[in-house]
């Protein structure tokens, strides 16, 4: 079973970065690097590492900016990977997918019981069962082990 995380609005507070939208429209990746974590990253890392040791696969499925060149998508991918390394350094990610905006996240499902944490309701609806709002992250992870 894989536990998947969206980033923006789920574990990363992109939308609180001042002028985030104009910067994204100007293809500036800084807001992705500047975003503060949402929640206690040390506690999240401990839970994820425990679950990883128990055999769970851990991954990220995150969209790039809505209007994006290929070069900007690559810059966003790099910024998001650096953010993960900075804030969840001890977590061994099995997969990190930073994909074009709007790519169906369910395309990355590896099994029927895969879990998705995502702030976008439409992503949770299209994922189906085992998709959760970010407010449920610690509750669900604790229930898994």
Regions found by a protein language model. Give the residues of each.
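A structural signal for isolated positions on well-ordered beta-strands in alpha/beta enzyme cores
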Residues: 57-59, 97, 115
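Alpha-helical substrate-recognition element adjacent to the catalytic core
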Residues: 2-87
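The start of beta-strands in P-loop NTPase/AAA+ ATPase cores
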Residues: 1-3, 113-114
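Lumenal/extracellular "mature" regions of secretory-pathway glycan-modifying transferases
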Residues: 75-78, 91-98, 133
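Conserved beta-strand termini and adjacent loop/short-helix elements that scaffold enzyme active sites
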Residues: 61, 98-101, 134-135
């Amino acid at each position: 079973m894989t536990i998947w995380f969206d980033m923006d609005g789920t574990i990363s507070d992109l939308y609180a970065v001042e002028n985030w939208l104009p910067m994204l429209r100007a293809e500036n990746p800084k807001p992705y690097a500047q975003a503060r974590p949402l929640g206690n990253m040390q506690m999240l890392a401990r839970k994820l590492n425990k679950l990883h040791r128990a055999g769970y696969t851990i991954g990220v499925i995150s969209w790039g900016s809505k209007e994006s060149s290929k070069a900007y998508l690559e810059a966003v991918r790099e910024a998001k990977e650096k953010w993960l390394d900075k804030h969840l350094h001890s977590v061994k990610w099995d997969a990190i997918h930073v994909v074009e905006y709007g790519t169906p996240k369910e395309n990355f499902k590896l099994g029927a019981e895969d879990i998705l944490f995502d702030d976008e309701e439409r992503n949770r609806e299209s994922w189906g069962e085992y998709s959760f709002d970010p407010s449920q992250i610690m509750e669900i992870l604790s229930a898994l082990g």
